[in-house]
Structures are given as structure tokens and as C-alpha cells.
Amino acid sequence: MKTVAVTEDFRDFPTFDAMMSEAFPPEELFLPSDMAKLANVRIQAYYGDDGAPVGMAVPILLPDAVFLELLVVDSRQRGKGYGSQIVNQLLERFPGQTILGYVERPDPSRPDNEQRLRRIRFYERLGFTVHYIHTRQWGIDFLVIAIGKGQDDR
């Protein structure tokens, strides 16, 4: 898998913007082409061995941790291990650091509840701890996830 640092002149914005639009509901959508304009954001695009775009991650460096603002894998590439590879690369890139993120809180009344549960299981398989502390953004409840220093490492 090849990793590319995304800059404002990134040629594949349309592909990755479409990937995001498919993966996230409108209230959570922040397109990579808009994210790249922010000074503190470092977007990483990932490509398979065949050169096809497979995913994207947005790690934000904080003083004592790394915040994983975004992880997305193209729907046609899911189930092939790319998400795990991306997370493992981030763990290698930031050794000894706590990596924090968030996932949507399960809600049986929501039509996307199964997708929310799948995301939680994905992170748990990789060794993340789900903290039942929630935060609310865009009218959505999220749970905090973490791995690394002070967490139940894998």
C-alpha cells in the first residue's frame, strides 16, 4: 500500500470527496478538498498495490496524543484489510503515543445502527478501547475510542 501526503493541489480530490460522500451522512461530511485548506490538518491518502485509491486518514497531532479525525476506506475496497493496514501504519508512525478518535454511539432506533456497531467492532479488533464517554457534534452522539499509552494495548 502506498501513502501520499495530501496538499491543496492533490489531483485525486474528486475521487476522495466522492468516497467521503458515500461513507458519511451529510451532517458529518467534511470533504478532503475543504480539510486540506486547514493549517493543522495532515491528510494521508492510501493507494493499493494496483494504484487504486483505497482510503484516507486524517491524524491531528495534539500535545499529548494523536487525534484520528477521520478514517475512511472505499466501499469497494472494504473487507480486504486496508482499514487495518492504515491503522497499523498510524500506530507505527506514532509509537508510544495515545491515538484517540470517535465513533457514532449505537442507537437501535437509527437505520445505520448496524454500521455503527461494525465500526466499533473494527476498532476493538485492532486493540482500541471504547470509552463510554460521549461527545455530541452535529446533533450526533459519539463515543471516544483510544489505543496506546495508558490504554489496553494489543
Positions of the model-derived regions?
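A short helix-loop-beta-strand connector motif used in the catalytic cores of GNAT acetyltransferases and
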Residues: 36-48
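Conserved beta-strand in the GNAT
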Residues: 45, 51-60, 65-72
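C-terminal "cap" of GNAT-fold acetyltransferases
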Residues: 115-116, 132-154
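Conserved acetyl-CoA-binding loop-helix of GNAT-fold acetyltransferases
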Residues: 73, 79-93
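Conserved acetyl-CoA-binding loop of GNAT-fold acetyltransferases
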Residues: 119-131
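Conserved GNAT acetyl-CoA-binding A-motif
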Residues: 94-115
